[in-house]
Amino acid sequence: MIVADSECHSEIKGYLPFTRGGVAGPETREEHREGQARRGSRGPSAFIPVEEILREGAESLEQHLGLEALMSSGRVDNLAVVMGLHPDYLSSFWRLHYLLLHTDGPLASSWRHYIAIMAAARHQCSYLVGSHMTEFLQTGGDPEWLLGLHRAPEKLRKLSEVNKLLAHRPWLITKEHIQALLKTGEHSWSLAELIQALVLLTHCHSLASFVFGCGILPEGDAEGSPASQAPSPPSEQGTPPSGDPLNNSGGFEAARDVEALMERMRQLQESLLRDEGASQEEMENRFELEKSESLLVTPSADILEPSPHPDILCFVEDPAFGYEDFTRRGTQAPPTFRAQDYTWEDHGYSLIQRLYPEGGQLLDEKFQVACSLTYNTIAMHSGVDTSMLRRAIWNYIHCVFGIRYDDYDYGEVNQLLERNLKIYIKTVACYPEKTTRRMYNLFWRHFRHSEKVHVNLLLLEARMQAALLYALRAITRYMT
């Protein structure tokens, strides 16, 4: 995945436009047309017009191919092309991805790809399942294991429960789950092996969110459906994504939405400068209100439940188990995870640095790149401080996973995130297999596609960090 050797340069130029400024040779334009013909007109995403990727991401991705070529050899996949709209993030992502799956570590390479299959299967992500099946066999994996989890070693099967919880309800993970995997026995895990497996599971769960959220298409299926198995409403079928943001946006109404968002950001920033922040009690109440209101933020009832494919279902135990709202009416909710009690910076990072130092450093870098990534633009506006908006998105994702920041006013979430954006965020983060093109089109209707991909990067990282915090807290409690 995400590779660039000498052959791959010509392959990716099927997506990249002919070189500007006359640098390329006379056949470049023809090579571009041939590459387009090989893939069809759909491009790497069912949601993003290929013209947008050519316009916004081609040059920056091409500049980064040299870095990727140093890492391995193979092909550039559709996921890399879309993620390459943000090349600084892609570089950081790839370093961790390569470490997890391709360098020496506690777990054999084939086992790591099998764990990735198990993780992607929880979300019915055929794109990732198929990719890791291929790599599993290429790294010497036993083909019998691909017949289903029941053919895999018991040690791998024992990971299924933690995989299930991390994918759907990470707040349920306890030190007893960790103890069950580490206790002495023929099929026990070492702590080093388990840490690598947990990071890999959360990496692949969140990557499935990115695949569904961006409508990534299988490389060999330019005329097919997205990598997701989720059905789209009939009106969406067979309609290529439009390159004009106004076509699906409601035109001037969408432009007014942008202006209204800019005004709300300005007012919030002014109130902060005047030190008109809410009290601690009020901020806690606003979090509880936001958590309760998230119950009402769900996909449309007319979206059908995806039907798991048998080739994917065979890697899943308890397939009916899925995300449930952290706070449900009429039930005893688990206690809120107060971020200050177990932070990534002070607790999670230090633990993983002790047990998996190479991974800890790259994880921390990737989180920082995602959190700080900005081009200071919003739709047609430039020179904008977007930190408040990015923090609202990050904290809302953590909110739906039950994590609260004591120093954050959750009233900002309601002011900055429109309902369609909340629906999209919650769907992609919690049940990504239900994501549709219509959801993608309905939020931020006047924004560039690269900005929507940016939202998906925040989704990927915030979701991964939330699940890791629950898992690492359970390990800390086990060790103490």
From Swiss-Prot:
Keywords on record: Acetylation, Cytoplasm, Isopeptide bond, Oxidoreductase, Phosphoprotein, Ubl conjugation
Database matches in Pfam families: PA26
Effect of residue 426 to A: Unable to inhibit TORC1 signaling
Ranges where the record places region Disordered: 20-43, 221-251, 272-291
Catalyzed reactions per annotation: a hydroperoxide + L-cysteinyl-[protein] = S-hydroxy-L-cysteinyl-[protein] + an alcohol
Subcellular location: Cytoplasm
InterPro entries: AhpD-like, Sestrin
Tissues with expression: Detected in heart, liver and skeletal muscles (at protein level).
An example Gene Ontology biological process: cellular response to amino acid stimulus
Annotated GO CC locations: Atg1/ULK1 kinase complex; GATOR2 complex; lysosomal membrane; mitochondrion; nucleus
Induction trigger: Up-regulated by treatments inducing endoplasmic reticulum stress.
Knockout mutant characteristics: Sesn2 knockout mice are fully viable and do not display any overt developmental abnormalities. When kept on high fat diet, they display higher insulin resistance and glucose intolerance. The oxidative stress induced by acute lipogenesis upon refeeding results in increased liver damages in the Sesn2 knockout mice. Any condition, like obesity, that triggers chronic or acute endoplasmic reticulum stresses have the same consequences in these mice and can lead to liver fibrosis. Sesn2 and Sesn3 double knockout mice display insulin resistance and glucose intolerance.
Modified how: Phosphorylated by ULK1 at multiple sites. Ubiquitinated at Lys-175 by RNF167 via 'Lys-63'-linked polyubiquitination in response to leucine deprivation: ubiquitination promotes SESN2-interaction with the GATOR2 complex, leading to inhibit the TORC1 signaling pathway. Deubiquitinated at Lys-175 by STAMBPL1, promoting the TORC1 signaling pathway. Ubiquitinated by RNF186; ubiquitination mediates proteasomal degradation.
Bias-annotated ranges (Basic and acidic residues): 27-37
Annotated spans, C-terminal domain: 308-480
Molecular functions (GO terms): GDP-dissociation inhibitor activity; L-leucine binding; peroxidase activity; PH domain binding; protein sequestering activity; protein-containing complex binding; sulfiredoxin activity
Domain of life (superkingdom): Eukaryota
Location of N-acetylmethionine modifications: 1
Bias kind Low complexity: ranges: 223-238
Record note on quaternary structure: Interacts with the GATOR2 complex which is composed of MIOS, SEC13, SEH1L, WDR24 and WDR59; the interaction is negatively regulated by leucine. Conveys leucine availability via direct interaction with SEH1L and WDR24 components of the GATOR2 complex. Interacts with RRAGA, RRAGB, RRAGC and RRAGD; may function as a guanine nucleotide dissociation inhibitor for RRAGs and regulate them. May interact with the TORC2 complex. Interacts with KEAP1, RBX1, SQSTM and ULK1; to regulate the degradation of KEAP1.
Function according to Swiss-Prot or TrEMBL: Functions as an intracellular leucine sensor that negatively regulates the mTORC1 signaling pathway through the GATOR complex. In absence of leucine, binds the GATOR subcomplex GATOR2 and prevents mTORC1 signaling. Binding of leucine to SESN2 disrupts its interaction with GATOR2 thereby activating the TORC1 signaling pathway. This stress-inducible metabolic regulator also plays a role in protection against oxidative and genotoxic stresses. May negatively regulate protein translation in response to endoplasmic reticulum stress, via mTORC1.
Protein family: Belongs to the sestrin family.
Written domain comment of the UniProt record: The N-terminal domain has an alkylhydroperoxide reductase activity.
Name the record gives this protein: Sestrin-2
